[in-house]
From Swiss-Prot:
HAMAP family: ATP_synth_alpha_bact. Produces ATP from ADP in the presence of a proton gradient across the membrane. The alpha chain is a regulatory subunit. This is ATP synthase subunit alpha, chloroplastic. F-type ATPases have 2 components, CF(1) - the catalytic core - and CF(0) - the membrane proton channel. CF(1) has five subunits: alpha(3), beta(3), gamma(1), delta(1), epsilon(1). CF(0) has four main subunits: a, b, b' and c. It is found in: Plastid, Chloroplast thylakoid membrane. Its EC number is 7.1.2.2. The keyword Nucleotide-binding applies. The lineage of its organism: Eukaryota, Viridiplantae, Streptophyta, Embryophyta, Tracheophyta. InterPro entries: ATP_synth_asu-like_sf, ATP_synth_asu_C, ATP_synth_asu_C_sf, ATP_synth_F1_a_nt-bd_dom, ATP_synth_F1_asu, ATPase_a/bsu_AS, ATPase_F1/V1/A1_a/bsu_N, ATPase_F1/V1/A1_a/bsu_N_sf. The record marks 363 as: Required for activity.
């Protein structure tokens, strides 16, 4: 027979009384009414904040952008296949945020900052809100430092400065992503952190970009944020904000960053899908009324910080695809009005073999020569005007049978100027090489050569200068000015190379 020991029972009761915690935990919960198409309708969650994260019973996380009188609309960050009608949901009390640290450099992550490159977890001690406010007027200063892309056509005529927002716009397959990736490759050794955000792209295209970065040693200073075409609309919508949060982390640490959004029109489509499923009223092209705010709050985060904040910068290059060159569509006009200029890529130029296919006539940088070193301003000042005049003259010359000598000379000069702007992909030029190239063309030294010889001659000239006149590069690097001494050295090198080149061609 079991004996009951009263002292043991009383000890257990005393222990339990001592351990008793009267703390009351309040949890804001709700019940799933309906789920499907990446959207859930929740009854309850009375005190949920706009944009608050909510957690479902089986672990899926969602964001609550819609609060209606009798339910809350939640967009799911996942497929939500295990969520059932009637299951419980609890509010987390947190707004969407991601971990941030230096360890993200060289990694490929998704919109939730989780690694997707199979190289293990990323350690981070800090976190940032995915949507944080843009710097105010006092926190900024005007753009004055150049961000070199390595592309002659851009750096000489449509210069981009650190802290600027420059749109890259054009039809599909015109080399928009190539311009952006070349700009990242050119940041090697420039102490610039790069973030490439792929929104709704094919997984194979993203893999190709990552492979290029790895082969060229660019991944060591680059973070790739990828949400491919098969990702849920919520994650495609969040990806650019995740990229911006990572770039801001470095900007506020007095570093220079470059962020590429490829492309915001896919983000707008994902946002349209979410909004229509949440039954928000549609507007133009079925986009919701706040689609302008979607992009403006993203692009306004790019800035050049004031001296008080350490002069860090975040330069944004959004890429927008047009349909048949129509830049007056809804999303292109929105982004054009937000950015500080646009680089327009033309399908006609691309098909004519002019690559990068930049239409210099209608491309513009609203920062202008403030984002160029003095040497580049001195050499490339008139190039854009000359090319625009040439394009006009070329169109006119098609209908004229006999042209005077001056017009023929201007056409010949323009053709050679256009030729020197051609560049192979993933082959960026240094500023010194660009100055050499433009000076040679703008001052008529290429007029002696046939158009087919221009590229070959310029390659040899740049090599000749590098090996035989290293002082030229030293002068440009140290003074950032095209001095008389530099000009004399360059003229001498051009004369030597022209004589040698013509002899080689005759032989």
């Amino acid at each position: 027979m079991v004996t009951i020991r009263a002292d043991e029972i009383s000890n257990i009761i005393r222990e339990r009384i001592e351990q008793y915690n009267r703390e009351v935990k309040i949890v804001n919960t709700g019940t799933v009414l309906q789920v499907g198409d990446g959207i859930a309708r929740i009854h309850g969650l009375d005190e949920v904040m706009a944009g608050e994260l909510v957690e479902f019973e089986e672990g899926t996380i969602g964001i609550a952008p819609n609060s209606e009188s009798n339910n809350v609309g939640v967009v799911l960050m996942g497929d939500g296949l295990m969520i059932q009608e009637g299951s419980s949901v609890k509010a987390t009390g947190r707004i969407a945020q991601i971990p941030v640290s230096e360890a993200y450099l060289g990694r490929v992550i998704n919109a939730l900052a989780k690694p997707i490159d199979g190289r293990g977890e990323i350690s981070a001690s800090e976190s940032r809100l995915i949507e944080s406010p843009a710097p105010g007027i006092i926190s900024r200063r005007s753009v004055y430092e150049p961000l070199q892309t390595g592309l002659i056509a851009i750096d000489s005529m449509i210069p981009i400065g650190r802290g600027q927002r420059e749109l890259i716009i054009g039809d599909r397959q015109t080399g928009k992503t190539a311009v952006a990736t070349d700009t990242i490759l050119n940041q090697k050794g420039q102490n610039v952190i790069c973030v490439y955000v792929a929104i709704g792209q094919k997984a194979s295209s993203v893999a190709q970009v990552v492979t290029t970065f790895q082969e060229r040693g660019a991944m060591e200073y680059t973070i790739v944020v990828a949400e491919t075409a098969d990702s849920p609309a919520t994650l495609q919508y969040l990806a650019p904000y995740t990229g911006a949060a990572l770039a801001e982390y470095f900007m506020y640490r007095e570093r220079h960053t470059l962020i590429i959004y490829d492309d915001p029109s896919k983000q707008a489509q994902a946002y349209r899908q979410m909004s229509l499923l949440l039954r928000r009223p549609p507007g133009r092209e079925a986009y919701p009324g706040d689609v302008f705010y979607l992009h403006s709050r993203l692009l306004e985060r790019a800035a050049k910080s004031s001296s008080r904040l350490g002069e860090g910068s975040m330069t944004a290059l959004p890429i927008v695809e047009t349909q048949s060159g129509d830049v007056s569509a809804y999303i292109p006009t929105n982004v054009i009005s937000i950015t500080d200029g646009q680089i327009f890529l033309s399908a006609d130029l691309f098909n004519a073999g002019i690559r990068p296919a930049i239409n210099v006539g209608i491309s513009v940088s609203r920062v202008g020569s403030a984002a160029q070193i003095k040497a580049m301003k001195q050499v490339a000042g008139k190039s854009k005007l000359e090319l625009a005049q040439f394009a006009e003259l070329e169109a006119f010359a098609q209908f004229a049978s006999d042209l005077d000598k001056a017009t023929q000379n201007q056409l010949a000069r323009g053709q050679r100027l256009r030729e020197l702007l051609k560049q192979s992909q993933s082959a960026p030029f240094t500023v010194e090489e660009q100055i050499v190239t433009i000076y040679t063309g703008a001052n008529g030294y290429l007029d002696l050569l046939e158009i087919g010889q221009v590229k070959k001659f310029l390659v040899q000239l740049r090599t000749h200068l590098r090996t035989n006149k290293p002082q030229f590069q030293e002068i440009i690097c140290s003074t950032r000015t095209f001095t008389e001494q530099a000009e004399a050295l360059l003229k001498e090198a051009i004369q030597e190379q022209i004589e040698l080149f013509l002899l080689q061609e005759q032989a």
